[in-house]
Amino acid sequence: MAKASTSGASRVRKKVKKNVSDGIAHVHASFNNTIITITDRQGNALSWATSGGAGFKGSRKSTPFAAQVAAETAGRVAMEYGIKTLEVRIKGPGPGRESSVRALNALGIKISSIADITPVPHNGCRPPKRRRI
């Protein structure tokens, strides 16, 4: 009877915690959801959170309060990595733009700059039709 070798078994690797003092907060605020990703200067993700992941479903995802809760969640995880200052880059026209920045500031993270990097088309794709209610 063959013996199972224990030396080839999968080992559990210890997660290495990076110590990063400053980073970039990417806020993607669409009309339906808000996604916050906090990265280091090289663009490696440290933490992320969404309004939907924070427990909001349906139309409540697209509220400023849902974006605030998501930003607090992402900010707390990023602070475990030693984040002290953030550069905020906001993309999109959604309602969670301002409240997510305020939530990060309220956590005690210093915000060095806020940049709006919303892509503006040079007359590219046709926009969606206007809503009639």
UniProtKB/Swiss-Prot annotation:
GO terms for cellular component: ribonucleoprotein complex; ribosome. Gene3D superfamilies: Ribosomal protein S11. GO terms for biological process: translation. One of its GO terms (molecular function) is structural constituent of ribosome. SUPFAM superfamilies: Translational machinery components. InterPro entries: Ribosomal_uS11, Ribosomal_uS11_bac-type, Ribosomal_uS11_CS, Ribosomal_uS11_sf. Pfam families: Ribosomal_S11. Part of the 30S ribosomal subunit. Interacts with proteins S7 and S18. Binds to IF-3. Belongs to the universal ribosomal protein uS11 family. Located on the platform of the 30S subunit, it bridges several disparate RNA helices of the 16S rRNA. Forms part of the Shine-Dalgarno cleft in the 70S ribosome. This is Small ribosomal subunit protein uS11. It comes from Bordetella avium (strain 197N).
